[in-house]
Amino acid sequence: MPTAKQLADIGYKTFSTSMMLLTVYGGYLCSVRAYHYFQRRSSRRQAAEEQKTSGAL
């Protein structure tokens, strides 16, 4: 039977690990959003440039 200190240590390590994984996952989600944002921005810019050049003809 684990002592109270051992249970507290296990709980702390479990909590710390879950917080670390949530932080890593949050960073991943944030970077994916930023990547898609910049992809859409560049494709919109390209479409605007194409529209300008086709409108000038």
UniProtKB/Swiss-Prot annotation:
PANTHER family: CYTOCHROME C OXIDASE ASSEMBLY PROTEIN COX14
Ranges in the topological domain labelled Mitochondrial intermembrane: 1-14
GO CC annotation: mitochondrial outer membrane; mitochondrion
Chief location: mitochondrion
A Pfam family annotated for this UniProt entry: COX14
Protein name: Cytochrome c oxidase assembly protein COX14
Lipid bilayer topology: Single-pass membrane protein
Assembly: Along with COA3, core component of the MITRAC (mitochondrial translation regulation assembly intermediate of cytochrome c oxidase complex) complex.
Entry-linked InterPro entries: COX14
Organism: Bos taurus
Task performed by this protein: Core component of the MITRAC (mitochondrial translation regulation assembly intermediate of cytochrome c oxidase complex) complex, that regulates cytochrome c oxidase assembly. Requires for coordination of the early steps of cytochrome c oxidase assembly with the synthesis of MT-CO1.
Entry keyword annotation includes Phosphoprotein: no
Cell location: Mitochondrion outer membrane
Keywords on record: Membrane, Mitochondrion, Mitochondrion outer membrane, Transmembrane, Transmembrane helix
Domain of life: Eukaryota
GO biological process terms held by the UniProt record: mitochondrial cytochrome c oxidase assembly
Keyword Transmembrane tagged: yes
Transmembrane residue ranges: 15-37
Residue ranges, Cytoplasmic side: 38-57
